Amino acid sequence: QMCIRDRFYLKHPEFEPDQPFDYSFSKLLSPLNIPPKNCGVGTDILIYDTDGISYPCHLFLPIVHGQNEVERILKDIDFHDDASLINDKCRKCLISNICRTCYGYNQIDRGNPQNRNLSKCKMQLAEAQVISSFQIQYYIAKKEHLTANEVLKLKAAIKCYELVHNNVFNFN
């Protein structure tokens, strides 16, 4: 299915690609020591329970963890500090700036919002390879008519492609 869609967009560059081909790799253009949080948990998102008490996300509600456990969990998490939401292994990853995770499921499944599901690393890497390769082809096909934003997207896709094709990733 994805091959059909990417061939369509390559034959018809007048159409804007949609998901997943429109993924932005622009965060890779800025060297960041600490990757930015990839969702609004605790900062841009608030969820309210039936008593009007706010929580950082629906996965941190008392109905999920129990009231006492939620209070214990939340007192140890600073959702405004991106560095506190990534572990050392992920911090060293070359594409951590574009890695997506769910901090709520990290807490539920692995006991800490920092502890990402490392079984997804290979999938995220494969996705980055395929999408960056597509974007390079797509933007080069319409190179005479690129906007400034599209030039930026092309540069970011090239950066991603170079990172994922020229490096060895340790999944252990």
Model segments located where?
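Short, small-residue-biased leader/transition segments that mark boundaries at the very start
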Residues: 2-4
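Secondary-structure boundary elements
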Residues: 7-16
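Generic alpha-helical secondary structure signal
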Residues: 13, 27, 59, 142-143, ...
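Radical SAM enzyme core and accessory elements
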Residues: 88-172
